[in-house]
Amino acid sequence: MSEDSEVVLVGGGIMSLTLAAMLRELKPSLHISVYEMFEDLATESSSVWNNAGTGHQALCELNYTPQKEDGSIDVSKALKINQQFELSKEFWAYCIRKQILKGAHTFLNPVPHLSFVVDDIVPYLKKRYETLKDSPLFKNMIYTEDREQIKEWAPLLLEGRGETQKMAVTYMAGGSDVDFGEIARQFGEKLSQKEGFDVYTHHKVRDLTKEGNIWLLDVIDTKSYERKQVKAKFVFLGAGGGSFPLLQKSGIPEGRGYGGFPVGGLWLICNNREIIEKHNAKIYGKASIGDPPMSVPHLDTRIIRGKKELLFGPYAGFNTKFLKKGSFFDFPSSIRLNNFIPMIQAGIDNVPLTIYLIKQILSTDRMRMRKLEVFFPAAQFPDWNAQFAGQRVQVIKKDKNGRGSLQFGTEVITSSDGSLAALLGASPGASTVVDIMLEVLKRCFGDEMKTSAWQDKLAEMVPSYNRSLEENITHFNECRLKTAQTLHLPFDEI
């Protein structure tokens, strides 16, 4: 059986469905097909239980503001990520006004973001605050070492803590908790109501090859075992960990030399309703010296299907699957002659990561509780249950010196003719989804992106695209106020 489509999106998560929504707004006549191998959209990395749900805006995440050798704080990444997440919020607000998405409360809730440190890390947090507060993006940040104020914001931090321990927090009221899976499902539901948009669940893309200007995809219906050949002019691989094997099968030169390293996650989930109700914040700490960025601990209020929850983690683990429901053969089968040496080099250069993962795998319940007790000293083991989170594939690619290097961000790979794009990597991931998709559009729909029709539409969809909010305070206030009002988030004008 053969099916034709102008655009094929592989994977039914937040990435693919956001690209679909943007393309249908820019070119409503475009025929788009989404192929998802599982029973529903957004069941892997986008699922509410498989990620932290943090709207990453660098309001509290200390790994985005490293301390340099001279003691100063590098805030360049924080400024960038803050504006990237704003693009996502602007597009969601636009979609609510256009009734593409339902009310903001169905997928996004205001939750304050706090950074928290103790003892000898306190000077770092104060210096971070002093560096960030002059930017309009962080002007409303509050720093305090006052225990009474901290107790008001986050009472669990003080329960059972010694009175002499030095501690400090920064507080940002404008943080958020996001259900990325719900956004993907709402996009899928709304877009499917119109002709020219098809979602195929239980459909696995097994292979893809290029013939002339057309991609031929080998697809199997995993329920009926019917095989199909699907033709497409443009293919986006947005299947989380499943994107990497398909990128390899595509054969595009731009994908050669890349490797993927799978890392699993685990949460401690609070089962005590009294404790859950006491806490209302996402609180991020600082990774221990030598630990990778993925190890940053955080104590998170989540709003999951309308119910308040409390999670702590993440604790990392290792298995060879690229997806939570994937195969143990995923990692070994991804090793090729063109990526073997870069992967070995990355392994040699990341011995601390290997040691960290071994420690995490061997961790006992008691050891996990000790990590939680840094945030909540009065925590008791019976109040918490361990639950596996999602699976991520960290990117390995050659650095500027040609040596394999482990990456902790998100990577967009496109073919030279712009007919295929693949998304690899992890954090900040879904929070910056709109910025990532704008990059895909720029690389793969370059001619259309230059037209006045697309430029005008993009200005309506994401008003701050290609504009620095820091350099135009009036525009900053107008854009952020309008977005905050639609999303029911707090906002104070600068």
Swiss-Prot record:
It comes from the Bacteria. Its cofactor is FAD. It catalyses: (S)-malate + a quinone = a quinol + oxaloacetate. It is an enzyme of class 1 (oxidoreductase). Belongs to the MQO family. PANTHER family: L-2-HYDROXYGLUTARATE DEHYDROGENASE, MITOCHONDRIAL. This is Probable malate:quinone oxidoreductase. It comes from Helicobacter hepaticus (strain ATCC 51449 / 3B1). The lineage of its organism: Bacteria, Pseudomonadati, Campylobacterota, Epsilonproteobacteria, Campylobacterales.
